Amino acid sequence: MKADPIEILVSNDDGFRAQGIRELAEALRPLGNVTIVAPDGPRSGASAAITSTLPIKLKLRHREEGYTVYSCTGTPVDCVKLAMNTVFKERKPDLLVTGVNHGNNAGICVIYSGTVGAAMEGCVCDVPALAVSLDDHSEICDMSHATAYAVHVSRMILKNGLPQDTMLSMNVPKGKPLGLKPCAVTDGRFVDEYMASEDARGNAVYWMTGRQINKGTIEGDLELMHAGYVTLSPIKLNMTSRRYLPVLEELLKRSV
């Protein structure tokens, strides 16, 4: 009996028209059937936001053998949720890949990123997931290294799987990488986050800007990416601080 083909779901937070998702999907096609379900426009910084008070729409944009494209009016996580409940209702995809994001999602960016947020939804749905981000914010940029590494890691995931509550976040430097390194996420934060300005009527407005710094001691994904390496960080869905949990229990006992 002929085995079912591999099914790959692809999403992002830059929108279905973005260069990154188009080139990623094309690179993944030799691995199996590829289905894009992505926002109908940019949704950067959407994190794990969902739409709960408005209806969302799913629109078929393109279909050919082994390759289908849908746009969704919701957030990146909406896209994955809706895909699981419609397109993949009868059979879950074998792999979820998000990106390629135009801009890195290293360090503290993981909690803000729609690209990572969409991949985390894969953990919720028990689907192995990989988020791919390139350290280049240009609308048109060289995606060749990012897509090549994405395919390499996707093959590894399809062969070996991932823990049920863990996804992988990949950050690719601009230019030719020195190699691939597994690492922790940098314990960072943003400084100088907003630039003050005025609108046409003289009212104060603020533009998001800023830069990320390492507030910890671990050399993580941000530093290694800046040093020229492709970084690969395992991220858990369950955010419980298990190290602090027994401490909390003891403190509560004392406070009674």
Swiss-Prot record:
Its EC number is 3.1.3.5. Binds 1 divalent metal cation per subunit. InterPro entries: SurE, SurE-like_Pase/nucleotidase, SurE-like_sf. Its cofactor is a divalent metal cation. The keyword Hydrolase applies. It comes from the Bacteria. PANTHER family: 5'-NUCLEOTIDASE SURE, 5'_3'-NUCLEOTIDASE SURE. This is 5'-nucleotidase SurE. The lineage of its organism: Bacteria, Pseudomonadati, Bacteroidota, Bacteroidia, Bacteroidales.
